[in-house]
Amino acid sequence: DAQTAPDVLGRLPIIDKRLIKDRFNDFVSAAFRRAALVEGHTNGSTGAPFAFYMNRRRRDRVRAETLFFGRWTGYRIGEPHVFLRLLFWHPKPVIARLLENQVILEPRGLGSVEIDRLLHRIGRSKAVTLIGYPSVLALLARRRLEAGGSASFPMRSAISIGEILLPGARETIERGFGCPVFERYRATEVGYIAHDCQDHRLHLNVGSLWIELLPPESGTTAAETA
């Protein structure tokens, strides 16, 4: 509970995905039948892809978080949106993308030809929200600014994922696509960790997670938790 969780977190060792993968069965709760759980997969962006399980209540909660935080950006369920991401492993099924009105585009190469092709497909999608790595979004935005932003983009918001959103990149993306930019910190296996609001302040997802702040590469638990 809220009184004891900080003390409990402080006693837990720091682990990584490789350790979980190597000793997977030790981490599976005996309170749930494996057959009744939903299997998920990380995309391998940290170099250690692995499968994990959640119960249906947890899966539905993550979906609810997507809708809740999406409203902060102006997105409404069912509206067309483009997701710029690398497809490391287990891409979302086609039927799921169709139901969500989602277009997934893979940003590879990113020479002038590839950038123009991506911009063309984004414009053709009529998406109201654009999701992607800030470095890629900024690259596309600069290309649009160089071209005078002639193509019509009915963009309502852009969402930065997977990397730190630097102030210069935020400004470039906002100018290039003519919409506000929001930061999203999310992990496939735990859901939403933090999300930007319209005042550009990050809010921790304390409704679903206990979040411990650790010194980088310290190997020890932090003195403070959030």
PLM region descriptions:
Residues 99-226:
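Active-site glycine/GP-rich loop and adjacent strand/helix microenvironment
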Residues 67-109, 162:
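Conserved AMP-binding loop of ANL adenylate-forming enzymes
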Residues 46-58, 98-111:
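Short, charge-rich amphipathic segments
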Residues 16-22, 27, 91, 112, ...:
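A broad, structure-centric signal for solvent-exposed, well-ordered loop/edge residues
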Residues 7-13, 68-71, 89-95, 181, ...:
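Intrinsically disordered, low-complexity boundary segments flanking structured domains
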